[in-house]
A protein has these predicted regions:
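Core segments of cupin and vicinal oxygen chelate
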Residues: 11-59, 106, 113, 152-191, ...
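Conserved short beta-strand elements that form part of the metal-binding/catalytic scaffold
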Residues: 40-73, 123-131, 174-204, 209-213, ...
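A cross-kingdom feature marking solvent-exposed beta-strand/loop segments within repeated
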Residues: 17, 27, 44-49, 58-65, ...
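N-terminal beta-strand motif that seeds the catalytic metal site of vicinal oxygen chelate
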Residues: 2-27, 72-77, 130-158, 171, ...
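Short alpha-helix boundary/capping motifs
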Residues: 23, 82, 154-155, 213, ...
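Conserved active-site tyrosine of GNAT-family acetyltransferases
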Residues: 29-34, 92, 122, 160, ...
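Double-stranded beta-helix
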Residues: 158, 163-167, 177, 199, ...
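Vicinal oxygen chelate
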Residues: 2-8, 90-143, 182-183, 226-270
């Protein structure tokens, strides 16, 4: 793969759309996310995979595909329009990035138009747009509303950070202990992606946004009553200032309920 170019990327990612995970215990995981974590299984989707929506307007925020080894299948980022998809594809192709396919209707639930590429650690990235949003499902006011952010581990997190900044147009929002941990954003939310130095490439954790601290405490109660005790929290982070509580899912993925993540205005020095 050609390394990150130094010129400023014209790609304008607007949000973290979702995450698809490889699951080694998909039946247990489906029951967990639907009955305990507060997501809604999209029953209309056929096949061995499972897809879940939150109460927000995104078609689905989490997908599970069966595999004999757990890990990230796809990180999904949003672009503003089909035209943005086409221009982003053209820019990445011209810069020599490894593209896995060309822009097209994606074979996933919803009406998404996009394409895929790989980051420097080989993780598949989706850049997509959609004109269709679902009606807000307000049945449970304490359920997750959307994905907040995810954190990945990387043996060369500096290079991976530079890839997302220079190739995909994310912005550096914060860092922790020098180059140990970088926080990247694409909008005013403090971060949508964290990149942590590690001895391997993997998912560190994925965070689900709930309405407020009260909603987070209620989700903790649901989990605790079902015998799932927090592995960390509840508490409040320094970088981002968000409240948090972490649990372990059936596959061993670390999952976070979070809220109150600070917003950063463009051009703000802090």
């Amino acid at each position: 793969m050609v390394g990150p170019h130094k010129r400023k990327s014209m790609i304008n990612i607007t949000d973290l759309r979702g995450l698809v995970l490889k699951s080694t215990k998909i039946e247990e995981a489906v029951e967990f996310y639907e009955n305990l974590w507060g997501l809604k299984n999209i029953d209309s989707w056929q096949g061995d995979s499972a897809f879940f929506e939150a109460t927000g307007d995104e078609g689905f925020i989490l997908g599970l595909v069966p595999d004999n080894q757990r890990g990230i299948e796809t990180i999904r980022f949003a672009l503003g329009s089909p035209e943005d998809v086409d221009t982003s594809f053209a820019e990445l192709k011209a810069s020599g990035q490894k593209l896995l396919d060309e822009p097209d209707r994606l074979p996933i639930p919803g009406e998404y138009y996009g394409f895929h590429l790989q980051d420097l650690d080989g993780t598949k990235i989706e850049l997509s747009a959609t004109s269709k949003t679902k009606k807000n499902n307000g049945e449970d006011p304490f359920a997750p509303q959307r994905l907040s952010h995810l954190v990945v581990n990387s043996p060369d997190n500096v290079a991976l950070k530079d890839f997302y900044l220079n190739c995909l147009g994310l912005k550096l929002a914060d860092w922790y202990k020098g180059d140990l941990f970088f926080f990247l954003r694409c909008n005013q939310q403090h971060h949508v992606l964290g990149v942590e130095r590690s001895d391997n490439s993997s998912l560190n954790h994925v965070a689900f946004h709930v309405e407020d601290l009260d909603a987070m405490m209620r989700r903790i109660g649901v989990m605790s009553n079902a015998g799932h005790k927090p592995i960390w929290g509840p508490g409040r982070h320094g970088p981002g200032n968000n409240c948090f509580c972490y649990f372990e899912g059936p596959d061993g993925f670390v999952l976070e309920f979070t809220s109150e993540l600070i917003e950063v205005a463009d051009g703000e020095e802090w």
